[in-house]
């Protein structure tokens, strides 16, 4: 809160300062007073004084399209946008309404015209036609945006807050979505939700990153990769040619803040990630890994559906008692309601109105 960017970003500051344009995801509102909403999952928020460190770290753009930006209601979001504006930092991915949240941010960097789109999966932060929030993932709207605005930019970057927590590979659907965005004219798609370092790929001339990991997130976690992540460096030319590099780091372990990995750890990290990333070119591998991951999550999600508390969720993982409540016929009905687009829309509308 004192604006001590050196104590927070340590040797990553050199990379921030060397960049012509620095973009970060702010996964919580900047607040003066708490005004938490009713939602599933943790409610996050930090003091408005934290803007000092972001400004002093030479951050140019803050992405607000994520699942926590509305955690402290419309008041928290509006406060965040105001504080960023007063600090001279651009924001993207959220706004006063759906149209405002979906605006492409235009940045001129030397001779290169860069367009930044920021999009979030549907959670408790989404803007509507008349209410503030984050820009939702809507592929039809994405295509419209690209048709109407693509020619205005030399380079289009999409920041997608999507993916499965603690899963380093893309799901089959996420990979399809990101690849389609490249096919429609995006030059880079950067996903930022997994809380662990994710794979990347070069696809039809564009770059896709399936998760960068946490940058500054000092919450305690037993997840192995919680304290690891990487910056994405894009080297862009006006004619559209580009190159991508990654800068691995350690964050919020026994020391506060974030710092680059030492040379040996960085080389090992890059090697492992490169090998993992090579595997996702094989669609069958992506599908097989996803099925295995979901198989291991079966009883977690069945507990969620039945509203179990933490104790019952843990017990269900051990003894699988939720199997007693779901016959094959009941599972088929559940699948039908979730899988069918029209039925899913009905269910979502009912729950949203409750």
Report each predicted region and the residues it spans.
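N-terminal catalytic scaffold of extracellular/periplasmic and nuclease hydrolases
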Residues: 1-65, 71-73
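Divalent metal-coordination and catalytic microenvironments
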Residues: 24, 64, 68, 117, ...
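Binuclear metal-dependent hydrolase catalytic cores centered on His/Asp/Glu-rich metal-binding motifs
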Residues: 1-10, 44, 108-156, 176, ...
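Short acidic, glycine-rich surface-loop motifs adjacent to enzyme active sites
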Residues: 19-31, 66-67, 146-169
């Amino acid at each position: 809160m004192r604006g001590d960017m050196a104590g927070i970003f340590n040797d990553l500051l050199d990379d921030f300062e060397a960049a012509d344009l620095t973009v970060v995801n702010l996964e919580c509102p900047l607040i003066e007073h708490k005004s938490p909403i009713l939602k599933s999952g943790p409610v996050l928020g930090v003091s408005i004084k934290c803007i000092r460190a972001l400004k002093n770290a030479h951050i140019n753009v803050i992405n607000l399209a994520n699942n926590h930006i509305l955690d402290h209601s419309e008041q928290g979001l509006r406060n965040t946008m105001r504080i960023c504006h007063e600090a001279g930092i651009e924001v993207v991915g959220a706004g006063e309404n759906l149209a405002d949240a979906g605006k492409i941010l235009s940045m001129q960097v030397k001779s290169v015209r860069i367009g930044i789109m920021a999009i979030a999966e549907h959670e408790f932060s989404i803007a509507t036609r008349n209410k503030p929030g984050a820009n939702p993932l809507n592929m039809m709207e994405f295509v419209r945006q690209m048709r109407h605005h693509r020619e205005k930019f030399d380079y289009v970057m999409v920041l997608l807050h999507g993916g499965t927590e603690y899963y380093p590979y893309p799901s089959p659907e996420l990979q399809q979505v990101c690849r389609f965005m490249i096919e429609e004219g995006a030059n880079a798609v950067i996903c930022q939700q997994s809380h662990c370092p994710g794979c990347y790929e070069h696809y039809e001339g564009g770059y896709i990153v399936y998760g960068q990991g946490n940058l500054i997130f000092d919450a305690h976690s037993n997840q192995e990769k919680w304290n690891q992540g990487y910056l994405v460096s894009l080297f862009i030319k006006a004619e559209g040619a580009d190159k991508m590099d990654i800068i691995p780091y350690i964050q919020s372990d026994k020391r506060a803040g974030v710092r680059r990995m030492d040379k040996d750890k960085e080389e090992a990290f890059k090697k492992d990630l490169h090998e993992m990333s090579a595997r996702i070119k094989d669609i069958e591998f992506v599908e097989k890994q996803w099925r295995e991951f979901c198989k291991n999550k079966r009883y977690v999600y069945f507990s969620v559906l039945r509203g179990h508390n933490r104790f019952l969720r843990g017990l269900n993982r051990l003894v699988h008692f939720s199997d007693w409540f779901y016959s094959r016929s009941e599972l088929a009905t559940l699948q039908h309601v979730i899988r069918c687009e029209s039925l899913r829309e009905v269910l979502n509308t009912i729950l949203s109105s409750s």
